[in-house]
């Protein structure tokens, strides 16, 4: 475990916040962190999650491909706080690969779902809502 730097520019405060949220979640057991931003844990049903902690305002499809190239076992991508999100294309790519893609507002609900990658919040009428963002021009 490191509290140093990582190639994704994720600050220690972002990592520490997510680490605390995961370790204190009632459905999480056997927690371990490595490579600074990778969190591995089991859920009470025995299923395993390999989560990458990011801090991306608008995570796009290219970044999902980068995650999977660098960390092929990742099955949960956390993009950061409530103000962060992802593009619709990134979400569709993750859904097609059974990979969870969420910001912090979606975190706790997803960890309770058997098919966590398919979790979504709903509006007052029961429609799915997602924190979609437009990718910033590079």
Where is each model-derived feature located?
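Acidic-basic catalytic patches of nuclease active cores, encompassing PD-(D/E)XK
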Residues: 1-37
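Phospho-regulatory, Ser/Thr- and acidic-rich intrinsically disordered linkers and terminal tails
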Residues: 33-38, 47-52, 121-138
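Short, solvent-exposed polar/charged micro-motifs at secondary-structure junctions
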Residues: 38-42, 89, 113
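Conserved catalytic cores of phosphodiester-cleaving nucleases, focusing on short active-site segments
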Residues: 39-67, 71-80
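A diffuse structural propensity rather than consistent per-protein peaks
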Residues: 59-65, 87, 131-133, 137
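Short beta-alpha junction loops
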Residues: 79-85, 105-110
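Short, aromatic/basic amphipathic alpha-helical patches
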Residues: 87-97
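Charged, structured surface patches that assemble and position nucleic-acid processing machinery
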Residues: 96-128
